Amino acid sequence: MKAYQREFIEFALEKEVLKFGEFTLKSGRKSPYFFNAGLFNTGRDLARLGRFYAAALADSGIEYDVLFGPAYKGIPIATTTAVALADHHDTDKPYCFNRKEAKDHGEGGNLVGSALEGRIMLVDDVITAGTAIRESMEIIQANGADLAGVLVAIDRQEKGKGELSAIQEVERDFNCSIISIVSLTDLISFLEEKGDNAEQLEAVKAYRAEFGI
């Protein structure tokens, strides 16, 4: 686990974005942890969040031309990632996001920001069922662009309806790389390093044993 990944987990815990306990997911599964990126909700939080996304992007080595943030949660993520890339990595990338409903006045259309062309890096908070990615792919393909990769905050590394995770299904269906700032494996490593809550650690490990990929 790299330093920025450890710092990200600490940041998420500090802001109560990452919580341990017992949570019922949309899938009906009982999870020992929950991640709610919507709680990164101040200017300072957003600035820090962008730096972690930018660090993961720089670390990945994936070539891309435009950052795309799907509405709604992806919009501030794309914006803050673009700012962090410019400020901390000397990388000035255009960014774009979509409207849920197309405008019929002014500039019109359903895209805001840069043109959606070339190789697209999609940024979002998490991938659960992959539905948002599939909707975004329709927009990307309609503009004649290609999906270079997807960057999310956390990869839960758990099975979907079949044996693959939602992330693995998206990788298979769209032939792209999906990267995350941290994964369930990193989370377990972090808990092992801390060593101050054996109960949390065992609950997360048991969850991985049952639902992990």
From Swiss-Prot:
Its cofactor is Mg(2+). Pathway: Pyrimidine metabolism; UMP biosynthesis via de novo pathway; UMP from orotate: step 1/2. GO terms for cellular component: cytoplasm. GO terms for biological process: 'de novo' pyrimidine nucleobase biosynthetic process; 'de novo' UMP biosynthetic process; pyrimidine ribonucleoside biosynthetic process. InterPro entries: OPRT (IPR023031), Or_phspho_trans_dom (IPR004467), PRibTrfase_dom (IPR000836), PRTase-like (IPR029057). It catalyses: orotidine 5'-phosphate + diphosphate = orotate + 5-phospho-alpha-D-ribose 1-diphosphate. CDD domains: PRTases_typeI. Its EC number is 2.4.2.10. 5-phospho-alpha-D-ribose 1-diphosphate binds at residues 26, 72-73, 99-100, 103, 105, 124-132. GO terms for molecular function: magnesium ion binding; orotate phosphoribosyltransferase activity. It is an enzyme of class 2 (transferase). Keywords: Glycosyltransferase, Magnesium, Pyrimidine biosynthesis, Transferase. Orotate binds at residues 34-35, 128, 156. Homodimer. Catalyzes the transfer of a ribosyl phosphate group from 5-phosphoribose 1-diphosphate to orotate, leading to the formation of orotidine monophosphate (OMP). Belongs to the purine/pyrimidine phosphoribosyltransferase family. PyrE subfamily. This is Orotate phosphoribosyltransferase.
